[in-house]
Amino acid sequence: VLSHLNVDQLVMARDSYRLNRLGKGKDANPKQYQELFEKSNAKVRARVERLPNIKLNQDLPVTQYADKLIEAIQTHQVIIVAGETGSGKTTQLPQIAMLAGRGLTGMIGHTQPRRLAARSVSQRIAEEVGEKLGESIGFKVRFNEQGSQDSIVRLMTDGILLAELTHDRYLTKYDTIIIDEAHERSLNIDFIMGYLKQLIKKRPDLKVIITSATLDVNRFSHYFNGAPVYEVEGRSFPVEVRYRPISDLNIAGSDDDEFDDFEENLPRAVVQAVEECFKDAEEKGHPEHADILIFSSTEQEIRELQETLEKHGPRHTEILPLFARLGLGEQQKIFNPGGKGRRIIIATNVAETALTVPNIRYVIDSGFARISRYSYRSRVQRLPIEAISQAAANQRKGRC
């Protein structure tokens, strides 16, 4: 895997600036240069020894493009990887980057829009490489961190990477940055990409990989001066979309009386949709394999829907909530199902991206989410409930 690299000549990214000063110019000091070079190269060799045994998941579509992506990472400083939900790009790209020789002179930083995704994806990658979380694969979110500077891959929220820029403006801890779900275009993501565009001029050794849904890739490519785009296919089966009858209510926003009416009718509509899904599963001959993922706007709404479904929904069905503040034990029930029988997962938009909830056959989408918005007038960050975008709707559709 590392045959294209001369490991003897590699040094840690954080040491390269000091080595440049010691190697030439008025601060040149051959003795100190040699000492620092040998010390830094020893760290690189230690990282080579710590590289995990990587076996890509052959069931995921992205692995078909692994050789092409490895060559692209080695050749270009910035690449864009476009793929639909279910392609496996979130869990496989860090491993493909390691196969391309990245992670030796610094960590592979992999950003996620949400804390839940950062934790669950890091756990999944650690399992795939056969290690405990916190060894070569770690994560860092607010108030929680596993791993160290010696880790090869670090999952984190985009907010954590932004915070690190305040005290490490050259991102010397990293030799590769992966920006996942860039199409979400949050303030953090946009700021990071703007910063990276300037940083790559000063750090030619830094590689940047941007992943996105297929809608915005040309815009990202143009922004990074024609960076190559690699499209990865998603699911290999069609998804049937059924629409509930159109309501006469004109939904405008969470402050609207009409939206309140919509919220009152939502539990009833969800129960009807669940019954329709289970009926469809019975007609198609797989009644025991009909897990449902329901997208809801808020944690409170999830609790209300859970209570309604427990009272009025189908029997012998496990109903589980999924939101950002959920404990690790509760998350494990969702991502590692152990029991038999049907499940209904009620989630906020944390389930839109990154790790796919297993065994989902049906998705019920309310079409709304609580979305972070910055108010220029009041100068505060708000979380209004809004209708989701077409890109988000496609992401949700792809969860089954």
Predicted regions mapped to residue ranges:
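P-loop NTPase motor module signature
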Residues: 1-400
